[in-house]
Amino acid sequence: MRSSSLLARPTVARLLTTMSATTLPGDVKVTEHFLSVPLDHSKPDGGSLSLFVRELVAASKAADDLPCLLYLQGGPGFPSKRPAFPPSGWDKSALATHRVLLLDQRGTGRSTPVTAKQLLALPGGPQAQAGYLEHFRADSIVRDCEVVREALCGGKKLSLLGQSFGGFCILTYLSLFPDAIERALFTFGLAPVGRTADEVYAATYKRMEERNRRFYQRYPQDVELVRSLVAGLHAAPAPLPRGGTLTARRFLQLGLLLGSASGFEALHDLLELARPPSADGLPDATSSLPDLFLLEVEAAQQHFETNPIYWLLHEAIYCDGGGGGGGGGGG
């Protein structure tokens, strides 16, 4: 039986604040909105969250009755993209015909955030933490979008653009409120409907094997470098400049970079920072790793601290009905 939160209808929003509009380069009028939404849409009189939406419109068309395009960011656990001005890419194309709404999904960015400190402070331990995080899944995000549609678009149908996990949210939106959507555009992020999370894992392993093979084919000089670093970190984990420890296992998690289009070069450039200024260019167990390398490792892995939803709910986005646990890629 479905939980009440899955069956709940979104509530009417309370528009907390609309900031003064600003016109930026490229003739774009930018308005920032804060809305109040329930933590649990099935219990509208319970706790609430603040939701942040940045609205973009061509200044010359600001008074026109334009349709809305809502952008759903990848993740889970990441705020909406911050646009460049003057606009380019899809932003520029969309602004020719639409008002563009950039939503910081609940728990991210300037919406009420989820933080490690906040979760650890919840009374009730891990069970309470898991219960709280249940309210930050796609079903709640979609109900927030319905609140945004009513408050900022006058209840008119939305066009949706979903990046990665944003596409997962679109599928949930189409399942729950199909009549609210004019059109839905996916950029990656077509969820593996009908497949268990374990099957996603298996496919991801094969893909990562191939990405690793291609990486070392492109940069064969990194084979011995990585082996040397792993051996050294096994023998003596390295303290990181801002706290924490770089173990061999944590170092190998840098392989996540291989999942992006520019990841091969990003990983190679980072590894190069670990090379000592010597003829063979390989670190040994007796030498300290360069501070710049350690700082860049921290920067590459900062999402552990800044985007906890990604690490805590990432696997859950692949659950399909009563399927197995686990999860794979995304982003």
What residues fall within each predicted segment?
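Non-membrane alpha-helical secondary structure
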Residues: S4-A8, V200, R218-L225, G259, ...
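N-terminal mitochondrial targeting presequence
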Residues: M1-L16
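Alpha/beta-hydrolase fold active-site neighborhood
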Residues: P237-G331
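Gly/Pro-rich cap/lid or specificity-loop segments adjacent to the active site
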Residues: V12, S20-T245
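A generic structural signal for solvent-exposed, polar alpha-helical segments
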Residues: S3, A151, D179, A316-I317, ...
